[in-house]
Regions:
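Class I SAM-dependent methyltransferase SAM/SAH-binding core
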Residues: 49, 55-102
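A short glycine-rich, Lys/Arg-flanked "PGG" loop and its adjoining helix->strand segment in the class I
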Residues: 126-138
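Short alpha-helix
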Residues: 172-186
Length: 241
């Protein structure tokens, strides 16, 4: 799939899943906020960039803990849903349409730049991480949260095959070592990391992606048994000069 075809697939799938995304994110907002508060220990003065924000799951979770959030996505439908919620509940959250690999912001304008469950949806994750790094100031931090590829590459290959059947916008899961290498390549030092297991009901997981009809049958035929995903959290900062 070319970059243009992948971009079209991403927009189509997320545009069709807006209501399900909003409902899912609202159901876990308080849990995510508690995780963010513990992991980031925000001061309340941060200006935060959320790249690949979707309808605002992370943006709205972190908003009460910081000064300002700028949420970026490429899908107009999810941006519209996010803006509507921001106007009602979170005046310190702004939604901007932009490409995660080419952000329209000046260097060093944010205290924290985050990519939350975003990297497995992009064809060039190294460009996105480079943009996150460019966007933070000298004392800024980068947060990456994503599902981690299994250590066994054959298991990872089969898992990516299922994920693409479920959601054509999926590219590939990155191994833990790749995420660490991307941060290191941009001059960042990993300050904190952790992993946890997330059990997934396959039927509900397919529903969330709007996977139906023949697509659903194919995805079910290759779905992992007792699907448990490994989720990694990575917090990095610039190396001291």
């Amino acid at each position: 799939m070319s970059d243009a075809e992948h971009a079209d697939a991403t927009q189509a799938r997320f545009a069709a899943s807006v209501e399900r995304m909003v409902e899912h994110e609202q159901s876990r907002r308080e849990e995510l906020r508690a995780q963010v508060r513990r992991f980031l220990e925000p001061t309340g003065d941060e200006r935060v960039l959320d790249v690949g924000a979707g309808t605002g799951g992370f943006a709205f979770a972190v908003a009460p803990l910081v000064k300002e959030v700028v949420a970026v996505d490429v899908v107009p439908e999810v941006l519209a849903a996010g803006r509507a919620r921001a106007e009602q509940e979170f005046p310190n959250v702004t939604f901007v349409e932009a490409d995660a690999a080419s952000l329209p912001f000046q260097d060093g304008g944010f205290d924290l730049a985050a990519a939350v469950r975003t990297l497995h949806h992009v064809s060039r994750p190294e460009l996105v991480v480079a943009e996150l790094c460019r966007s933070i100031g000298m004392r800024g931090r980068v947060l990456v949260i994503d599902q981690i590829a299994p250590v066994d590459p054959l298991v990872g290959f089969e898992l990516d095959r299922f994920e693409r059947a479920r959601d054509p916008s999926h590219t590939r899961l990155l191994p833990d070592t790749d995420i660490r290498s991307l941060l290191d390549a941009n001059g960042l030092v990993l300050r904190r990391s952790e992993q946890y297991q997330e059990a997934r009901d396959v039927d509900g997981y397919l529903d969330l992606a709007g996977c139906a009809g023949d697509e659903r049958e194919r995805a079910l035929s290759i779905a992992p048994e007792n699907y448990t995903a490994t989720i990694g959290w990575y917090l990095a900062a610039r190396q001291p000069v």
